[in-house]
Amino acid sequence: MQSVAFMIDLSIKSLRGILMKQIKRLFQIDPWKIRTTHLDKENLRLQESLTSIGNGYMGMRGNFEEHYSGDHHQGTYLAGVWYPDKTRVGWWKNGYPEYFGKVINAINFIAMDLQIDGQTIDLATTPYEDFSLELDMQNGVLSRQFTIQTPKNKVRFSFERFLSLEKKEAAYIHLTIEMLEGTGTITLHSKLDGDVQNEDSNYEEHFWEEIAIETQETLGFVTTKTIPNNFEIERFTVTAGMRHFIDGASVVPTYTQQPLALTAELTVSLNEGETTAITKEVLVVTSRDVPETQQITRVNELFSEMTTLYPEAKAGQAAAWAKRWQLADVVIEGDDEAQQGIRFNLFQLFSTYYGEDDRLNIGPKGFTGEKYGGATYWDTEAYAVPLYLALAKPEVTKNLLKYRHNQLPQAIHNAQQQGLKGALYPMVTFTGVECHNEWEITFEEIHRNGAIAYAIYNYVNYTGDQDYLKDAGLEVLVAIARFWADRVHFSQRHKQYMIHGVTGPNEYENNINNNWYTNTIAAWVLRYTRESYLKFQEETTLKIADDELAKWADIVENMYFPVDNELGIFVQHDTFLDKDLMPVSDLPLSELPLNQHWSWDKILRSCFIKQADVLQGIYFFNDAFSLEEKRRNFNFYEPMTVHESSLSPSIHAVLAAELGMEEKAVEMYQRTARLDLDNYNNDTEDGLHITSMTGSWLAIVQGFAQMKTDHQQLKFAPFLPATWTAYSFHINYRNRLLFVEVAADQVAFTLLDGPAIPLTVYDQKYTLKDRLVLPIRKEEVHV
């Protein structure tokens, strides 16, 4: 048995040196821009990830428009377009999914290869100067400039591109060419290139086949379709169209067809001091919205609607982003690193998802890479829902819930595959059918089911929308509850219900028994579902027998939760305390991250925790635990946590803030806010950590400002981090819009829209009618 002294010793060990290990910062610090004047060829994949753009309908990595022969990861992705790749495992087990769904690299429509007097421009080999790259987060425009010197001339190229928020199918690529010295002819080969493949494809497999290539004077079209599959899964057809303008005038290029590709050639000759501008407009439609036979017609219709020139389109893009930022922006004064981090994360989140389509969810990588297959995980419900509730209309979050409700039949199928009743929502999915093929995740990481139920509770508690609970949410809850009731077993020896053979949120342990978090959320689901059913029993068509309700109540009353009274903690699972317990700070820095240096066997036997596990449950059910229980568990588990999941730092930031551990809270905020910008986990080159980007917002709003909505009441207890001079944010809550400002000496709440609302600040109750200003409370800071 470990001593209390050991627990306290762990709690005071700092991870500061570990967090600073191998930070890789490619871009300058700027509140609104991601900018560099250095082309880092050794880290171009990382640079491409960090300059990704999207509009919820499609997105792409920050690839160059012109040909680049060096190492890079070309990637353009379309929401909801994927391919079922045959599951490949060494040892097949009953219950495995037949296929692994993966987002597939789609048509490369930004390609604009360049030649100066016949010489191909390739920044991997061509000498260049005056390079700059900038992502402007205020308007979503990615720009890049460079100058090429040849024996005959000196030419400046300036690219801009964006994916339209006003017309989701539209993309704009704008190239300005300046002849600084001499004269010359610039040849542009603008392409729609469907001959692409995934970075992770097996044996260089291609997922697309050509359907049609057409030209209509100024317009060019390429239609491709995903190759047949063996699983009767829908095939997707995609049509991309392009047209070009030179100095605002429409042009008819010279077209050349290749397999799966169309090239439009444009040529301009410039004298010294002359400048020209070429705009490429692209439209992309998919069979998710437009049948294959109607796609070229639809693209033509969309082109006819696009009557503005590039400057007006760019201004419209800026206005659309300004509307989103007006509600979503978090302003931090006194710390530009922190400011850049939160804005970058919010920008990428809203580039990935804004709730327009209830057939879509949020993949962990969004449109920025192919890792994790681009599919949906439980991350959305656990981490993204609180942010979208506060920063968007309720319909946005409701669409996330509809996504899961629509897939309930498939979740029931997943449970049946494991021989269980009810519904088991998948760990990885596009359609609701499980796509993950690792047994310790597919079969055992069943706590994900609880996150789906918790998101329903979170939505109803935050919005007050009882009709959704009655009309749709309850059906999902009942199916999940039936799964848990069947998955538990009754221990005759202990006379309690237990759950064996699971993987908790800490994926650095598999096949464990009685994971505290899993047992806790299972019991909570059964309780919440039972209470909700009894509330609407007379109004719902769902029927639950009295003996089933009684069984649920018995499980809740007699669920086993591992605890240690000497340490005063909830035990992560039955045998966790038998491990060789030590803090992460005792490890050599050269061995971190563990998942890149240790064998999987060594990780599984260690005490080290990938992400919040017990603390995840304390975060979810915060008001069920005393401050002392929170403190003891935080001090015990956090020092053993390596935070090698991007989802981890935010939960620790929120809890540390509540416990008065300001330094730890800020440290965790910095990690979650700049996880990708500083490449903390040394894996951002594979794509951004989109769903965990909500963590920086959670750390500020639920952590530093201590916003809570327990029992349908809005509460705050803000503090100001020592290195900041002020911060502010907006909150949508039950048809009200609030503006919260936290400064060194005061905190202010302004009701910008909606009726008066009860508000609790520092445990004192107020009614917010217009503006409330209070002195900020100076809390005792704990280590």
Curated annotation (Swiss-Prot):
Q: List the disulfide bonds.
A: none
Return one Gene Ontology term, BP aspect: maltose catabolic process
Please report a single Pfam family linked to this protein.
Answer: Glyco_hydro_65m
The positions annotated for binding substrate are: W378, D379, K610, Q611
Question: Catalysed reaction(s)?
Answer: D-maltose + phosphate = beta-D-glucose 1-phosphate + D-glucose
* The protein's annotated pathway: Glycan degradation; maltose degradation
Q: What is its EC number?
A: 2.4.1.8
Can you provide one Gene Ontology molecular function annotated for this UniProt record?
A: maltose phosphorylase activity
| Active site (record annotation) | E507
| Keywords from the named record | Carbohydrate metabolism, Glycosyltransferase, Transferase
The knockout outcome noted for this protein's gene is:
Cells lacking this gene fail to grow on maltose.
Family under the similarity heading: Belongs to the glycosyl hydrolase 65 family.
Q: What does this protein do?
A: Catalyzes the phosphorolysis of maltose, leading to the formation of glucose and glucose 1-P. Does not have maltose 6'-P phosphorylase activity. Plays an important role in the metabolism of maltose taken up via the bacterial phosphotransferase system (PTS).
Name this protein carries in UniProt: Maltose phosphorylase
Q: What organism is this sequence from? A: Enterococcus faecalis (strain TX4000 / JH2-2)
In the UniProt record, the gene name given for this protein reads malP
